[in-house]
């Protein structure tokens, strides 16, 4: 009887350990992208391959979050009846102006939400998933379940080329 009780206790602890470990691995917290002089935020409208180069057609936006988002929101929408932004972020895009940016072949690309399996029930936030440029192009074109063109992206541009692309998570 003591062996059975011990076995049940050990099994229970093992199950709790695995659940806690699995939760900890997938429970990375959101961290805002640091604003730098070489980073802009934009919607990506198109990705094309031209003359051996990958080009993004983008529309730059102003991205705000936290207290800064609340401040800009209240300045721009004083009659909203709200005390701040509903979701903690605010996007300003006063004029849509598309322009092209070349992507460096070795650009670092980081995604938060995209279709990995073709099943809507599998779509979930998976923080900071690195993908290759080829994978990113495939993700962008595969818009049946998750249309990533509807997400802002933080683009780091150095020497005229995009060297880093980070998908902005939207709650």
Predicted regions located by residue number:
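Solvent-exposed hydroxyl-ligand-binding patches built from regularly spaced Ser/Thr
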Residues: 24-171
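Sec-dependent N-terminal signal peptides of Gram-positive bacterial secreted proteins and lipoproteins
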Residues: 1-25
């Amino acid at each position: 009887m003591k062996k059975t009780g011990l076995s049940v206790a050990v099994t229970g602890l093992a199950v709790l350990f695995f659940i806690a470990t699995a939760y900890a691995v997938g429970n990375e917290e959101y961290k805002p992208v640091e604003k730098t002089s070489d980073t802009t935020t934009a919607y990506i409208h198109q990705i094309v391959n031209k003359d051996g180069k990958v080009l993004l057609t983008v529309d730059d936006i102003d991205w705000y979050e936290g207290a800064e988002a609340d401040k800009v929101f209240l300045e721009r929408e004083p009659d909203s009846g709200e005390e701040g932004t509903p979701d903690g972020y605010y996007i300003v895009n006063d004029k849509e102006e598309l322009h092209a940016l070349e992507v460096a072949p070795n650009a670092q690309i980081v995604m938060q939400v995209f279709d990995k399996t073709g099943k809507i029930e599998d779509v979930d936030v998976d923080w900071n998933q690195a993908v290759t440029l080829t994978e990113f192009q495939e993700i962008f074109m595969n818009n049946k379940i998750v249309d990533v063109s509807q997400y802002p992206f933080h683009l780091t541009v150095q020497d005229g080329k995009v060297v880093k692309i980070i998908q902005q998570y939207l709650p």
